């Protein structure tokens, strides 16, 4: 399927032409049919001789409904431009072409209607000249009459040629469906419709609306139920548990987590045909912006149109043809999106705005706007991988994809430790060499400083290591530690071979070890430990070093003691009581109970009932 929007002056026969092509009335409202005037978007479809199905979005031509017109034109990949033979090129023809040009649409057909009322030649010649100076360039043209049917077969042939040359959408792309209608169906609930430009929607999918998950209950396209719909297509999506008041034209249904929302974008202005005509001398070359007074054009309150949404926008000039746009609400945009700036007061399209950056740097210092403008010279709307990573120091691959970095560029970096451009790959992150070296140096210094400050605990915890380097992700600690020649063990980063220095407590620790070697189950009391200089910090360090095992109730044993206990318990009649275990181990309840609970936790013993345990497996002394 392909989707084509109409464009042209009011009452030039757009709806009549769509009706003649499809046999369907595109005007949905009784008032539209009564007045013979399209007010809102209309929809119809047909099957061409080639078998290709084409959906039409019929847009209103009247100046008062230009917002509705832009909502229909924005998501469409091609346009059917209509001019009446008996009226020729008119004001709304010019404004609609300005919108087409601002959006950069390159695929279209010119249809001169009402050829049964007047010679179509003059209107055809003028319209061709106007379109040739726009992004459409030289397009196929035909004179038709929706009343007599003259030229309709040729138009259908031209439509077939047009759709066969439209770009093939990426059906694996993330979904962004700009909503142009929402309504309810009894027994089904809320339905939204829109033009799906790329990607695939399936029944049962979880998508996202204003940051909240929504579930796809059912799908229709061109009046038929589908289990999945692939772009490009007109699609109706039945959403579960979404009130009709919670979704409206201008909302976007998107792939969860795949579309960052933004209130601020840096853009390049693309002149509309109206702005060029307003300022241009007759010898202006197409695309020449030198004479356009953007300060005049951008004065006052402007509206930004993108997809099906229209929002007021604050414009801040950056360079000769670049501006920063700030919106009152966050939108799911990416670099490369084409938008329209319109002056509602003067009722005309001012410019197109090509999105260059959806995550631009703050402009805090004096002169920062001019510096930013110079940085954007040559930016194309396809984000450069190295530029985006360099500006941030480090960036997740998923975030770069969401910013609009081409998938093939990101795929080429997959599996590499270093990209050809010198970026470092660590898991899902790409890092500049400078930032990577900074992390390595900071982590090394932090580990050394911690060792000096805490000789009992030479290891830096993962979170402390992350904070020391200002890492954006704790999972980067391991890769940075390896690069620094450090050791990551049991969740701590150390110098290789580093061990706690117990200082004066070393003698006390050896005394403890000596006592427990002679009497493994005779755990010393807290006063004994204190006399040896072994407080909580020293014992915690000794446990991390593998020299002691700490159990509940301040019971301190050797790490081998549980295995020694199992030798004794295995020899008991099974099951056994706590008292029997205590007597066999020749120890106290203070030691026996936490020791048995420890054996339970390791799966070596298990409770049979409230008073009995049994051995499950006898470990070796090295267990």
List PLM regions with ranges.
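P-loop/Walker A NTP-binding module and the surrounding RecA-like catalytic core of P-loop NTPases
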Residues: 4-8, 12-20, 64-70, 88-91, ...
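Conserved catalytic-core segments of large NTP-driven translation/proteostasis enzymes
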Residues: 115, 129-275, 279, 285, ...
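Conserved G1/Walker A P-loop phosphate-binding module
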Residues: 1-59
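Conserved nucleotide-binding/hydrolysis micro-motifs of P-loop NTPases
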Residues: 62-63, 86-90, 105, 114-119, ...
């Amino acid at each position: 399927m392909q989707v084509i929007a109409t464009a042209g002056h009011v009452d030039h026969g757009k709806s009549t032409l769509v009706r003649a092509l499809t046999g369907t009335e595109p005007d949905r409202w009784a008032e539209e049919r009564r007045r013979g005037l399209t007010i809102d978007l209309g929809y119809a479809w047909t099957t061409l001789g080639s078998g290709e199905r084409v959906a039409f979005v019929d847009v209103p031509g009247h100046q008062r409904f230009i917002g509705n017109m832009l909502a229909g034109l924005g998501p469409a990949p091609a346009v059917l431009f209509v001019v009446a033979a008996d009226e020729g090129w008119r004001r709304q023809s010019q404004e609609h072409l300005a919108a087409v040009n601002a959006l950069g649409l390159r695929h279209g057909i010119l249809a001169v209607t009402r050829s049964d009322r007047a010679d179509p030649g003059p209107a055809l010649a003028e319209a061709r000249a106007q379109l040739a100076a726009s992004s459409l360039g030289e397009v196929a043209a035909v004179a038709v009459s929706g009343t007599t049917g003259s030229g309709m077969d040729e138009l259908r042939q031209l439509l077939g040629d047009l759709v066969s040359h439209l770009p093939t959408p990426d059906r694996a792309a993330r979904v962004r469906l700009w909503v142009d209608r929402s309504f309810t169906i009894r027994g089904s609930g809320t339905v939204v419709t829109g033009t799906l430009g790329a990607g695939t929607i399936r029944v049962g999918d979880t998508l996202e609306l204003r940051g909240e998950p929504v579930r796809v209950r059912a799908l229709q396209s061109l009046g038929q139920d589908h289990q999945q719909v692939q772009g490009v297509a007109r699609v109706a999506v039945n959403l579960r548990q979404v009130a009709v008041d919670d979704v409206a034209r201008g909302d976007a249904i998107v792939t969860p987590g795949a579309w960052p929302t933004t209130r601020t974008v840096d853009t390049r202005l693309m002149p509309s045909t109206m702005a060029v005509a307003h300022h241009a001398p007759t010898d202006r070359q197409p695309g020449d912006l030198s004479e356009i007074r953007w300060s005049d054009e951008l004065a006052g309150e402007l509206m930004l149109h993108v997809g099906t949404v229209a929002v007021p926008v604050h414009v801040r000039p950056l360079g000769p043809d670049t501006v920063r746009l700030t919106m009152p609400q966050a939108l799911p945009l990416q670099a490369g999106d084409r938008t329209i700036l319109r002056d509602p007061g003067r009722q005309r399209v001012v410019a197109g705005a090509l999105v260059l950056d959806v995550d631009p740097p703050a402009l805090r210092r004096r002169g920062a706007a001019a510096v930013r403008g110079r940085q954007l010279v040559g930016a194309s709307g396809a984000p450069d991988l190295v530029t985006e990573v360099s500006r941030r120091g480090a960036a997740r691959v998923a975030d770069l994809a969401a910013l609009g970095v081409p998938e093939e560029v990101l795929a080429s970096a997959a599996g590499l430790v270093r990209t050809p451009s010198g970026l470092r790959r660590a898991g899902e992150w790409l890092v500049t060499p400078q930032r990577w070296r900074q992390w390595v140096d900071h982590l090394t210094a932090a580990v050394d400083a911690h060792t000096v400050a805490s000789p009992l605990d030479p290891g830096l915890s993962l979170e402390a290591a992350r904070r020391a380097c200002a890492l954006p992700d704790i999972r980067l600690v391991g890769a940075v530690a390896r690069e620094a020649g450090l050791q990551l063990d049991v969740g701590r980063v150390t110098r290789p071979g580093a061990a706690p220095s117990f200082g004066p407590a070393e003698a006390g620790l050896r005394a403890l070890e000596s006592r427990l070697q002679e009497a493994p189950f005779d755990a010393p009391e807290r006063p004994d430990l204190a006399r040896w200089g072994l407080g909580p910090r020293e014992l915690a360090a000794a446990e991390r070093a593998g020299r002691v095992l700490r159990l509940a109730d301040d019971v301190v044993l050797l790490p081998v003691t549980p295995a020694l206990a199992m030798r004794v318990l295995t020899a008991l009649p099974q099951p056994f009581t706590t008292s029997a275990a205590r007597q066999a181990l020749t120890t106290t309840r203070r030691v026996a109970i936490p020791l048995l609970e420890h054996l339970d936790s390791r799966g070596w013993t298990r409770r049979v009932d409230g008073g009995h345990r049994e051995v499950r497996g006898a470990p070796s002394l090295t267990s």
